[in-house]
Amino acid sequence: MGKLRVMSLFSGIGAFEAALRNIGVGYELVGFSEIDKYAVKSFCAIHNVDEQLNFGDVSKIDKKKLPEFDLLVGGSPCQSFSVAGHRKGFEDTRGTLFFQYVETLKEKQPKFFVFENVKGLINHDKGNTLNVMAEAFSEVGYRIDLELLNSKFFNVPQNRERLYIIGIREDLIKNEEWSLDFKRKDILQKGKQRLVELDIKSFNFRWTAQSAATKRLKDLLEEYVDEKYYLNEDKTNSLIKELSTSRLNENLTVEQVGNINPSGNGMNGNVYNSSGLSPTITTNKGEGLKIAVEYSRKSGLGRELAVSHTLSASDWRGLNRNQKQNAVVEVRPVLTPERGEKRQNGRRFKDDGEPAFTVNTIDRHGVAVGEYPKYRIRRLTPLECFRLQAFDDEDFEKAFAAGISNSQLYKQTGNSITVTVLESIFKELIHTYINKESE
């Protein structure tokens, strides 16, 4: 086999393509399908391809007229199968888009496919949704294996668990019964046990072991962040005071440290420990997660506190009650300890490494006598959200240079797939199956 020919559906900004690029696979993109005009611009900028390669609305594509390809990648819109999307499944037109993916497999019969979707798909409609999908893959001639993979185990500080399905055309591999671990009681094992009873065509893919999370959210935060990403201190003052009387944990977990809503409730007001993981980022109107950062007296710098929630795509502009998921608490050294809002020569904060004013008996410039560290709350930046999905900084810069707004950049990362997870899948698929098939 020469270059691996790839067709991409529901392409977004091209996480599959970024993964193939990163592991050095020589591939040819024969086409992609994306209806969001901003995602198309980002995709073309990041992967240096012409918009003419975009086939547009997948439901309007004549599948028989598509060019030949070896690998089909993509994940149909997941909102109809997720809790956040009210789980309407195939009753939602977004759910029926799955069958456009299957029709493409049926008409073009590529050798391999990789499909991604939300964890909730497994037990949606009491498992019937997964049953229908697996049967559809079998009916069009593919043996499959599936696994739940969490981004936090793939060098990314984001707790993002997604379902991945690998398919190989049945004439290329013998049928293998799944090696089920009956000691595992998770929903995936239960789902696979159901599929065994349906006589699904299967094989055993060697998935990367998910051992331990290694990165903290603070490891990917930008050093210098524009003031526009910070929340109004009037809205965060009560939480800041509360945090100042406690010590944040260093556990590699998703830890909510507080809520900035007046009621103290609502996911949109949650603030998370940046020494841990991010929760899953999503497409929640294009805004960034809020996190907490502790000021270190020893270094004089903001000390970020571990894994991010799943990325969401919320609006970057001023946070309303629906736009507060992705913000960060950061500490800034103030010029005066007793009044954070007081200014000295028109400035509010001292620069990093700048010497303190001379201490005298009149003023106590920069001297925090008996006081706790200062915290601030801000949203994650679009670049930080790109990093949470394991895209290169250069990928972000290309999309930004293409004129994509912050709001759209947030949405695009929330809609995307973690690149390092896909890298692990492609490494095994290429090493064990694609290279072997070409011998």
Curated annotation (Swiss-Prot):
Keyword line: DNA-binding, Host-virus interaction, Inhibition of host innate immune response by virus, Methyltransferase, Restriction-modification system evasion by virus, S-adenosyl-L-methionine, Transferase, Viral immunoevasion
Location of the SAM-dependent MTase C5-type domain: 4-436
Pfam family membership, one: DNA_methylase
EC id: 2.1.1.37
Catalytic activity from the UniProt record: a 2'-deoxycytidine in DNA + S-adenosyl-L-methionine = a 5-methyl-2'-deoxycytidine in DNA + S-adenosyl-L-homocysteine + H(+)
Function field: Modification confers resistance against restriction enzymes that recognize these sequences.
The protein's name in its UniProt record: Orphan methyltransferase M.SPRI
Organism: Bacillus phage SPR (Bacteriophage SPR)
